A protein has these predicted regions:
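Nucleotidyltransferase catalytic core that binds NTPs
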Residues: 2-3, 10, 14-502
Length: 502
């Protein structure tokens, strides 16, 4: 689908299975946690501290049991009591304990103590590190509520600046002992990756799930910063999390830094638009501007507590060969980030899964902007045959939430009629449901659109750019054309200037 209708392309073959599957090399051999811990312990140049809060009390145990821990561990501590934890690291806003700021304060405090208490004169060859985590476990009453932060601050050589690798995890198994064991193993994997394989960020990511089940632990955010990772684009790390099956959705902000959904979306009004954005066109901007102006007028929407998301599905990132082109992804991300937008990469082909994802973090009003042709597909029963409750189950998820869909009109060509919710074809069997949603204003037309941009299709713009033909500049926002030209995005090649005649 194209233009205003391109933002929800999905087919029955693209349906996402409920069972999480990780994409790993079957030929790759992995070390056990004990082998990794012993390998670190036997390296006399590695020396550091461990600090663990909450469920995550198991990582350091692997190092003590592996043998040779006295060569590696300067200190291990567990700040289990909340008052003790606050006394050591300081209270967080909202008195939270399992959050990114708490983990960063732990890393800063513990690494600071290393520099304060260990003389570099006495340890001239030591590469110092600090491992920290803060974890809240799941329970049988709330089986998917567990989550936490795990991080490492480390040197790659003595006297070098430090590097940070931070991940966020969600826990899905209600068995607390299994959660503890899995977090312990993942902690060993992360520390081993940072200390041994820091030159290979891809291996750090791959090794996270060595001897850990995706059914128990989901990694939904990773961030690598520091001189050892100057060549790493954290947006590509986000993409890899979804591509590998580690998680189904990731966020990154206008600055290109990865975001954790529970921090970015918590209790917020959310307005999302799905598209390929290849590139961003005038029709995309018309959709978001007019949809936004309607959304902020809603009584239950707080303009100061609103998060706008530009969503790209993994399916929309695939090339004609079925692979994800990372350069093409970065081209799209660069434009969206330059426009000050937060980007969501997801594996949710169906809208009800996207709304269910948002509902983990907020009960406030949500809005989705879509082209009317996409709404036609939303009302196609074939996309819901895998559900026990069929289409009604999916719509129950969609519309039992506080959701409103803003429908942008479509016109296949400049000579054809404009299609809106009033003229959209609906199967007679589904017409009562459709009329109910229209009557209750859960489906609303965007009426203040620009009819002069309805003919713009992203694929048409992309074809013009790649063919080196003129005219595409008029189909994209003013700033975007210069960015495409200046950065040679989407395969743009400047037209050679004509040679001067002799």
């Amino acid at each position: 689908m194209r233009g205003a209708t391109e933002q929800a392309t999905f087919a029955p073959d693209d349906l996402v299975m409920d069972e999480p599957m990780i994409q790993q090399d079957p030929q790759r051999a992995s070390l056990s946690p004990a082998q990794k811990a012993r390998r670190i312990n036997m390296n006399t140049d590695l020396y550091g501290t461990f600090a663990e809060i909450g469920v995550g009390q198991e990582t350091v145990r692997h190092f003590f049991r592996a043998g040779g821990a006295s060569q590696t561990i300067a200190k291990a501590m567990s700040a289990y009591d909340k008052d003790f934890s606050n006394a050591i690291y300081g209270a967080e806003p909202g008195n939270r304990f399992v959050c990114e700021s708490r983990l960063r304060n732990m890393l800063k405090h513990e690494y600071g103590l290393i520099n304060e208490r260990l003389s570099r004169k006495d340890h001239p060859t030591k590469k110092f590190f600090t491992f920290a985590n803060t974890i809240a476990g799941s329970t049988f009453e709330r089986p998917h509520s567990g989550h936490g932060w795990i991080g490492v601050r480390f040197q790659t050589s003595p006297d070098e600046p430090t590097n940070d690798v931070i991940i966020h995890v969600r826990l899905h198994d209600p068995d607390i002992s299994l959660q503890q064991e899995s977090i312990g193993v993942m902690g060993v994997n992360l520390l081993h990756g940072c200390l041994i394989n820091h030159a290979d960020p891809d291996e750090i990511m791959t090794a996270l799930y060595d001897n850990v089940s995706r059914h128990v632990v989901e990694v939904d955010m990773i961030q690598m910063n520091g001189p050892a990772f100057n060549h790493v684009d954290n947006r590509l790390l986000s993409l890899q999390l979804v591509k590998r099956g580690y998680t189904d959705a990731v966020l990154f902000g206008p600055d290109g830094q990865n975001l954790q959904a529970s921090e970015a979306l918590y209790r917020k009004n959310i307005l999302a638009i799905r598209g390929s954005f290849r590139p961003v066109t005038k029709v995309n901007i018309d959709m978001i501007m007019n949809g936004y102006n309607m959304f902020i007028k809603e009584q239950r929407v707080d303009r100061q507590n609103l998060q706008v998301l530009f969503e790209i599905t993994l399916n929309n990132l695939r090339s004609d060969t079925g692979d994800v082109d990372e350069k093409d992804f970065i081209d799209r991300a660069d434009i969206l980030c330059s426009l000050g937008q937060t980007v969501l990469i997801s594996n949710y082909q169906e809208y009800y899964k996207l709304v269910e994802y948002f509902s983990r973090y907020t009960k406030a009003r949500m809005g989705v902007i879509m082209g009317v042709n996409n709404l036609v597909e939303v009302f196609d029963e074939k996309y819901y045959r895998h559900l026990n409750g069929g289409m009604l189950e999916a719509f129950g998820i969609l519309f039992t939430r506080d959701l409103k869909i803003y429908v942008y009109p479509s016109r296949a060509s400049i000579n054809e009629d404009i299609m809106t919710t009033e003229t959209m074809p609906v199967h007679p069997r589904l017409k009562p449901l459709y009329d109910y949603l229209l009557f209750n204003k859960r489906l609303v037309d965007i009426n203040s659109y620009d009819p002069n941009v309805l003919h713009i299709f992203s694929k048409q713009v992309l074809d013009l750019i790649r063919a080196g033909k003129p005219g595409w500049e008029d189909l994209v926002p003013p700033y975007v054309d210069n960015m495409i030209k200046d950065n040679r995005l989407f395969g743009y090649v400047p037209t050679p200037a004509p040679k001067a005649s002799a």
